[in-house]
């Protein structure tokens, strides 16, 4: 009987240790004393993948980068990724009007919320099925999560708001 209890306790301790090890990789805290770092390409093991697709209105290649050790809101993810983002005069940090000076000021002055006549940016999040899903909330209120991809696509008039970035998602865990 004693050896059965002893083996049961050892087995329980092993199961708890395995569970902790598996869980600690996904919920590991970000060390805020280490600055965010940026690498080209999609994240493979940690961080937040950021995709900027300039759409069919531009010949610019898509920006694809992995931002590691970042904690904050999606709006601030642009700065961590060293990308220039501009809001509108009316909503300077509430509505993405221009990314990396696209569209140009001549095309969209960004004084008010851009309408569909000049095109606008659409914001997407990656889901567990490696699909882009249109975000129901904006970048200034969405908290970045390690292991979740964020994407932007510039849409021309007539394109569906559901038209996602043309970059395929890759599945990865969060091993910061």
Regions found by a protein language model. Name each.
Residues 2-176:
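Ubiquitin-like/PB1-type beta-grasp interaction modules and other compact soluble beta-rich domains
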């Amino acid at each position: 009987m004693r050896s059965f209890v002893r083996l049961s306790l050892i087995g329980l301790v092993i199961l708890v240790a395995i569970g902790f090890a598996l869980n600690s990789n996904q919920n590991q805290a970000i060390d805020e004393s280490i600055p965010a770092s940026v690498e080209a390409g999609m994240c493979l093991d940690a961080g937040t993948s950021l995709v900027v697709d300039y759409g069919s209105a531009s010949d610019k290649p898509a920006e694809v980068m992995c931002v590691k050790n970042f904690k904050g809101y999606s709006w601030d993810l642009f700065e961590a990724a060293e990308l220039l983002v501009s809001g509108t005069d009316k909503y300077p940090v509430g509505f993405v009007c221009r990314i990396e000076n696209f569209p140009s000021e001549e095309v969209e002055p960004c004084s008010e919320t851009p309408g569909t006549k000049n095109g606008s940016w659409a914001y997407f999040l990656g889901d567990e099925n490696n699909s882009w899903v249109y975000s129901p909330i904006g970048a200034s209120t969405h908290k970045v999560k390690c292991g979740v991809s964020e994407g932007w696509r510039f849409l021309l008039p007539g394109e569906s708001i559901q038209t996602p970035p043309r970059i395929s998602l890759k599945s990865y865990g969060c091993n910061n």
